[in-house]
Amino acid sequence: MVENIPPVLSSHHYKHLKHLDRCKQLVETCVELLSKGDHDALAYLARTLGIPPQLRHKVWPLLLKYHPMCISPNILSNTVVWDSEHNFYKLVSGTSSSNDINKEPREGLENLILHDLKKYFRNVSKSEEDHELQVLKEAVLKFLSKWSRIFQYESGLAWIAVGLAEWIPIIENSEGPIVLNERKNHTSGTTTPNQPNPTCLSPLFKEYPLPSYLKSKLPKDSIFDFNEIYERIVLVILHCPDTITAQKLVEAESLKNSAPRRGSYAIKEGKLNYSPFLSGGDLGYQTQVFFKVFSTVLPELYQPFTEENAVQPSSKRTGWLYWWMKCSGARAFQKQDRGRLWDILLGWRPEPNRHTIDFFLNYNSKKFDHLYHSRFRNNLDFFNSTSKNDPFWFPDLDTIPLGTSKFKYDFNVFEELLDRNSYGHDAPPDPVPGNNDDDKIPFSLIDSHIQLVFIYIAILQHNEFKLLEFEETETSEFLNNVPMLSRADDICFKRLCDDDQSTYQNGFTSQEDLPKRPGSSKLRIGSDAKTSRSFNDILTMAGDIWRKWLWQELEECFVSE
């Protein structure tokens, strides 16, 4: 007797097969692009569809080699702050002078780093952890040896190293790359507490298999070693524009009230003089935007939250935002979702011309736009089947030459956007016949850290009703240990080589696929059907929130002349 498949299950099964096929195409495309060194196309895939977990250890180093924030770095500082009253930088209270920063006893610093790293290895037998700890500690120390005058050690540096080692191999052997993969203890009542796991390492291809014919096409040589990759990804995560200079220039420009306006709209007094929604700001500005959007989009959920001490890791109640905002998801997010967040950061690329690069990197003095191509050169069939919009597109924004004399600052762009998208404005001319833009790469239109802000809002919106029902302890647990958001993606990549698709039916109910953070409570958080969605759903939602919120902001802050 043939068993009838319920319509809902059949629909889900079909969706899964389609998703699995798309994941296979993505893997094959990435391998081919890797073999050709096409970092432009790989960056586009990273910021839109994401890099397959099997391939991050090869793709991320290539993306970091050509990342604008690595070629021309500028990071936020935790050693000095700007004194606006006296117009100079001063040491953060309790910080050693710049000449003494590197004189702190190395042994004390090493112990501090090891103390934080061991929180990850708490369930691993001690005999197996020493080598991994030393490798990770050395990566952090090498970063500090170069950058400690600007950024002294914080626990976030250790957790970024751990997060990186979950995708970038510490060692390699005949089985391929070996990565961190701690087996967290499940918190059901049947597990034995504090029982150590034999190892925290596992072959990447065991968890995320790759067919042999694709393995053979991967580049054999490594671009960077682990320490070099770590330094570069920290430069991206801690990147910060020169906000002090930018604010001064924008304020000076806004004082030219007598200058004629290009469009039909002017900035309301005191509004948007320095609001780098596009070009990005420092950590304080990112946090300010987060809470502003949070309170606007999710007013009910926002009520119990506070901005006080929001980016300090010491507070259990508010420390989650330190991991979200300052560390780009380290520690608080599951590795699969953090991988996607870091894909977005590493795949960020502005239009490859000097003006646009300098619009985002306003401190830049290097010329490197020649390193990039503006059109797809390989696998056009695959790219033509994907959306040709940046997830954070906005009407007409991609047609404005950012950074040129007319659009030097964010508020210049805002004026133009509102003017172009207002009622009565002339429609743009039709495309010129024969002008084929099918192979044109859609580049990033806003700062990557601002993108993450809206992704975080989308995550909260996605879980809004659940969070509204939670008690304070449950909410804190959720925010400090965000349940997996991309489970459908993860299942497809783990079963890339499976022939028997019937395993799918077990995939969405297996609790083994729900990793838990060590020491988490017995709360059953994130085990509903929504966890089976793709991360791309969150990314799409974030783009929608961005467009709606920006338009409301423009209408509120500008007045018709």
Curated annotation (Swiss-Prot):
InterPro entries xrefs: Rab-GAP-TBC_dom, Rab-GAP_TBC_sf
Sorted UniProt keywords: Cytoplasm
Main localization (coarse): cytoplasm
Organism domain of life: Eukaryota
Cellular compartments per GO CC: cytoplasm
Region (Disordered): 507-526
UniProt keyword Signal present: no
Residues covered by the Rab-GAP TBC domain: 50-349
Compartment(s) where it occurs, according to its Swiss-Prot or TrEMBL record: Cytoplasm
Transcription as UniProt keyword: no
Family: Belongs to the OCA5 family.
Protein name: Oxidant-induced cell-cycle arrest protein 5
Gene (name only): OCA5
